[in-house]
Swiss-Prot record:
Needed co-factor(s): heme b
Location of cross-link Tryptophyl-tyrosyl-methioninium (Tyr-Met) (with W-95): Y224-M250
Family statement: Belongs to the peroxidase family. Peroxidase/catalase subfamily.
Enzyme Commission code: 1.11.1.21
Reactions the enzyme catalyzes: H2O2 + AH2 = A + 2 H2O; 2 H2O2 = O2 + 2 H2O
Xref: Gene3D superfamilies: 1.10.520.10, Peroxidase, domain 2 (1.10.420.10)
Site (Transition state stabilizer) residue list: R92
pH-activity profile: Optimum pH is 5.0 for the peroxidase reaction and 6-6.5 for the catalase reaction.
Protein name: Catalase-peroxidase
Gene Ontology biological-process entries: cellular response to hydrogen peroxide; hydrogen peroxide catabolic process
PANTHER family in UniProt: CATALASE-PEROXIDASE (PTHR30555:SF6), HYDROPEROXIDASE I, BIFUNCTIONAL CATALASE-PEROXIDASE (PTHR30555)
Any one annotated GO CC term: cytosol
Originating organism: Rhodobacter capsulatus (Rhodopseudomonas capsulata)
Length: 576
């Protein structure tokens, strides 16, 4: 039966109209103001109906940690673990979630589980096979349900993976709440193709600092830099410059970058072992029946026997060997030469290396392979500044065994904001938590301060604009900015053109002089904004409820004076 055919008795249900690609309002009017993003955090889209996750997670069953430890060595036939341990995969999943964070606008990061679960990041080329990592976590998520969010589970899995391999971690803080749909307000770049050349992102590709803000990754579909080199052309010295800029845009310095890379690359391996054309569709394009197993290659059984190993020297990853292996690759006397992976990607291998020094095959422990370094790894060997960071930290703490947990923790925490927004006793008390400090003074005379502000001679515009300029810097993405701390009176905010520096200096100066009675400057700025709104609304009648009967309203609206009063009431309602 077909509802489109009226001549024969067929299905009366219309097909296609609701699924066909139509023309949206945005397509018709591309310059119209798009208000969709105002609804992306609407509670109506949350299926948990007011569930307070941050309160509930405080009672999380401690068995979660044991379950994750068990998962690490429970290799599944549909996606076997490298060396019998899923640690490398879980660490990559956690880091690619946290590492999408951008300091410039606070977007990305692992705060809501969005990079791992939703487009476009769930299908980026750099995130290939991470859907399998999430699928491995599914039995645990199903067991604990709402007691642990996807956002927390993904990052905690990375933490437990390191613990399972012998690393003592800094701790972990729970409390990240999931979102339920892709975000519409994140700019990932203007390119239309995955891995499009980097040139369009830079004013001058030779100067990494000219990358378009707020971007951090060098190409569409990558988390950081191209492992083969700038635009896929190996040149370690050139790549080093882009590494420094990209990781700086994530808030990391050279030492943290070295530690993070060494710690991650030591316990994992490269997987470019076959023809990319043999891969299936990415998760977002895959059939709904295989969404958790998308991208599997048709030659998987043969492909997994031909790995390009990277990192660990032992059949099972061992963090205790990480420093002697990963960092020695950069600082030892090995000479390296360019080669290509089975997939045709540029990489580096030792010119000579003893057989016993080669890492074991991930699946056949009787076979050894040459280790590899990406162009990004080689960049740290040839860059003098990076090597100074390696050598300065090595005598005190092997970067990949101790320090690697610091940048990983800092980037995971970067999207938390205030430490009090997190839960659980494992939360590390570090400065990364961006706490607002001690609470401001209380008990001061509000009426007295308001009177002083009113007598300052500042206009309504000064009062309201300064308060709004202070508050509007708040970023829900990483909880930075906002009125706390009155940072608007300090550099760089005091010099921003959008804050009208001359007007701002006068307003803050007047307010600070009259902020007696023990009030903080931050509180006085906000209070002054409230006073400005009150002054603007002074003398305006408030809306009365219930409204007059419709008939009486219609009669009144024919009268000119009534229309004027009506307008004033509507204005007061909007202002209030």
């Amino acid at each position: 039966m077909d509802g489109k055919d009226k001549a024969t008795g067929k299905c009366p249900v219309m097909h296609g109209a609701m699924t066909a690609a139509g023309v949206s309002n945005t397509s018709w009017w591309p310059n119209a103001l798009n208000l969709d993003i105002l609804h992306q955090h609407d509670t109506k889209g949350n299926p948990l109906n007011g569930f307070d996750y941050r309160a509930a997670v405080k009672g999380l069953d401690v068995g979660l940690r044991a379950d994750l430890h068990a998962l690490m060595t429970d290799s599944q036939p549909w996606w076997p673990a490298d060396w019998g341990h899923y640690g490398g995969l879980m660490i990559r999943m956690a880091w690619h979630a946290a590492g999408s964070y951008r300091a410039a606008d606070g977007r990305g990061g692992g705060n809501t589980g969005k990079p791992a679960r939703f487009a476009p990041l769930n299908s980026w080329p750099d995130n290939v096979s991470l859907d399998k990592a999430r699928r491995l976590l599914w039995p645990i998520k199903k067991k604990y349900g709402n007691a642990v969010s996807w956002a927390d589970l993904i990052l905690f899995a990375g933490t437990v993976a390191y613990e399972s391999m012998g690393l003592k971690t800094f701790g972990f803080g729970f409390g990240r709440e999931d979102i339920w749909a892709p975000e519409k307000d994140v700019y990932w770049g203007a390119e239309k193709d995955w891995l499009a050349p980097s040139d369009g992102r830079y004013g001058d590709l030779a100067k990494p600092e000219t990358m378009e803000n707020p971007l951090a990754a060098v190409q569409m579909g990558l988390i950081y830099v191209n492992p083969e080199g700038v635009n896929g052309q190996p040149d370690p010295a050139r790549t080093a410059l882009h590494i420094r800029e990209t990781f700086a845009r994530m808030g990391m310095n050279d030492e943290e970058t070295v530690a993070l890379t060494a710690g991650g690359h030591t316990v994992g391996k490269a997987h470019g072992n076959g023809d990319a054309k043999a891969l299936g569709p990415d998760p977002e394009a895959a059939d709904v029946t295989v969404r958790a197993l998308a991208g599997r290659t048709r030659i998987w059984a043969a492909r997994r026997r031909r790995p390009s190993p990277r990192g660990s020297r032992a059949p099972g990853p061992r963090i205790r060997r990480a420093g002697t292996w990963a960092i020695s690759r950069c600082s030892s006397g090995h000479d390296w030469e360019l080669t290509k992976s089975p997939a045709g990607a540029w990489q580096w291998k030792p010119v000579t290396i003893a057989e016993e020094a080669k890492p074991l095959d991930a699946t056949d422990l009787t076979t050894r392979h040459d280790p590899l370094m990406t162009d990004a790894d080689m960049a740290m060997k040839v860059d003098p500044s990076t090597m100074r960071s390696v050598r300065s930290s090595w005598p005190i703490r092997p970067p990949s065994t101790t320090l690697s947990r610091a940048p990983g923790s800092s980037c995971c925490i970067a999207t938390w904001g205030r430490r009090r927004a997190t839960s659980a006793p494992m939360c590390p008390p570090r400065i990364w938590s961006a706490g607002p400090g001690a609470a401001g003074p209380t008990g001061w005379d509000v009426a007295k301060v308001k009177a002083q502000i009113a007598a300052s001679g500042l206009s309504v515009a000064d009062l309201v604009a300064t308060a709004w300029d202070s508050a509007r810097t708040f970023r829900q993405s990483d909880y930075r900015g906002g009125a706390n701390g009155a940072r608007i009176r300090l550099a760089p905010q005091k010099d921003w053109a959008g804050n009208e520096p001359e007007r701002l200096a006068g307003a803050c100066g007047a307010r600070t002089d009259r902020g007696g009675a023990g009030a903080s400057v931050a509180d006085v700025i906000v209070l002054a904004g409230n006073l400005g709104v009150e002054q603007a609304a002074a003398g305006v009648s408030r809306w009365r409820c219930p409204s007059p009967p419709v008939a009486a309203m219609r009669a009144a609206m024919t009268d000119g004076p009534s229309l004027t009063c009506w307008s004033r009431c509507m204005t007061a309602s909007a202002t209030g």
